Every structure is written in C-alpha cells, then in structure tokens.
Amino acid sequence: MLRLQASLQRWRLLAAALLLPVPALGQPAPADQTDAGKQVFKRANCMGCHKWHGNGGGGYGGDALSLRKTELTREQIIETVGCGRPGTGMPFFTRGAYDSVKCHDMTREDVGAQIPPEANVFLRPNDVEAVADYVLARIKGRGEPNYSECVDFFGNASRVCDIYKAQQPLGGPTTSEKPQ
C-alpha cells in the first residue's frame, strides 16, 4: 500500500512538472510579458511594416500606422493583430479569422474582397496579448526612437543602432519617457 502511494505521488509530481512553462529549446525564457511580446513582434515580422521602433511608414503591405502615435486600447490592439485591418495590407494573425472567429463584428462574407491578407505565421492568443502588452509598454506614447531603445531591441552587438548613438546627448544614453 505504501509503495502504491509513493508511486502515485511520483506520478503526480511528474504530471505537475510537465504543466510548468518551459522556454523554447535554445532560447532563454523572457524576463517578463513585454520581453515575450518583443520576441513575438520579431518572429511575426511586425517590424517589416511598423519598423523596429513602431513609427510605421512604408512596408510590404503599404503604409503602416505609427504604433507610437496610436490611440488604440489593449483590446483594440489585440483585435487588430488577430484580425488584421480590412481593406489594408495589415494581415490577420489568428487562425480562422473571419471564419470561425468573428472579427470587427464581421464574417468573411461580410468583409468580402476587403478581407485582410493572411499572415505568414499564426499566433496563439497569449502571443497576441504579449504583442499588445509590448506595444503599450515599450512603444505607444514614446517620443522619437533613441539609442537606448534600439539597443534594447537589437542588443549591443548590432550596428543598426550606430545612427542613434551619434544622436544621443552627452552624458550617455537616455530612454524615451512615456507621457503621464
């Protein structure tokens, strides 16, 4: 009887351990939700249109809106990432958008020829939420991009940030402050 209880206890511990989140092989676990969102932002190639800094401009799908100047709420960002923007190049990242998932209160039939393109990769709901949290915490409401933000995005080894290094004020890197 004791042996059976010990065996059951080991199985419970193993089952509980399997439910713990494990980072992808070869990748460190994100420090917080915004770091996870930054990784999804990169993986989903949001920077292909919105650029690394979120200012937007010309991209593969046309002129992307500035995420720094957006007035969208968290819920609106989640819907826009998941469902795209009808009539624009902003793709949808949720599998089944406009089919099994109603988007912007519309179905595929409602949106017709204005259906957004399908993204190259679909995102899980928690990934879409992580991107929204990243945009709200690190992009929305910020001033012009700077060296510190660039290094935060690309790392110290990237030469991409050299242009911002020359622009930083004497005394070292600064960070853009979000307005209160």
Residue ranges and their predicted role:
Residues 8, 31-35:
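Juxtamembrane/transmembrane-helix boundary motifs in multi-pass membrane proteins
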Residues 12-23:
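Bacterial N-terminal signal peptides
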Residues 29-32, 43-44, 52, 91-180:
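Flexible coil segments in periplasmic/lumen-exposed cytochrome c-class electron-transfer proteins
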Residues 38, 51-120:
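Gly/Gly-Pro-rich "capping" loops immediately C-terminal to redox-active cysteine motifs
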Residues 44-45, 85:
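Structural motif
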Residues 48:
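Short, cysteine/histidine-rich loop/knuckle motifs that typically chelate Zn2+
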